[in-house]
């Protein structure tokens, strides 16, 4: 912190030590046995634009390059990643320390999703925002992520509790924004872009 700090962050640059410390103070640590090198968020302002498909395709691509790849499905109430990889419900094992072991696809991609915890993949998840945000944190720090090179986080549409939780609690290296050319969609996606900018999360690309 500068000796001339006025404690008014509105007048402070993004490189300020005080502001940087504030941004990292909410990060949730991984368990010691876990290791994740890069975290890439996949977001969209509006649903139905192919966000989960893009997430799956990027994970498969990085996996084909020899990288150990994982997907954290943060779309708790509308998860589709397990189905995309042919995984069934109740596919998550537990360690002796009560840590979740992610399911592994036929390609070797580690996946953690709410649908993998349900008895039936059509059962609804009827939770309020804080509970959903808590589940996302658990998927991050109560799951055994072993030697992951790239983790893709499939987030729900919008700028609500889950994107905020991911941006604050996970060490996100950047995001991919998925959109479609309609004017209405573009307006909503602009909100996601501004949210990322306000939280100093790099935008890596637009699909």
What kind of feature is each model-predicted range?
Residues 90-95, 114-130, 135-165:
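Switch II (G3) loop of P-loop NTPases
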């Amino acid at each position: 912190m500068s000796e001339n700090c006025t404690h008014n962050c509105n007048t402070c640059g993004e490189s300020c030590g005080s502001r940087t410390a504030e941004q990292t103070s909410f990060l949730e640590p991984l368990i010691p046995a876990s290791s994740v090198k890069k975290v890439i968020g996949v977001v969209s302002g509006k649903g139905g634009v192919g966000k989960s498909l893009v997430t799956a395709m990027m994970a498969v691509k990085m996996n084909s390059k020899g990288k150990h790849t994982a997907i954290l499905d943060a779309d708790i109430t509308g998860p589709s990643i397990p189905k995309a990889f042919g995984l069934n419900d109740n596919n998550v094992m537990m360690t002796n320390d009560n840590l979740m072991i992610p399911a592994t696809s036929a390609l070797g991609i580690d996946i953690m999703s709410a649908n993998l915890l349900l008895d039936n993949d059509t059962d609804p998840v009827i939770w309020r925002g804080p509970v959903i945000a808590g589940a996302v944190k658990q998927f991050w720090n109560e799951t055994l992520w072993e030697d992951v090179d790239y983790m893709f986080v499939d987030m729900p549409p919008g700028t609500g509790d889950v994107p905020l939780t991911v941006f604050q609690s996970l060490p996100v290296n950047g995001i991919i924004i998925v959109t479609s050319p309609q004017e209405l969609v573009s307006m909503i996606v602009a909100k996601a872009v501004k949210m990322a900018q306000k939280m100093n999360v790099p935008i890596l690309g637009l699909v």
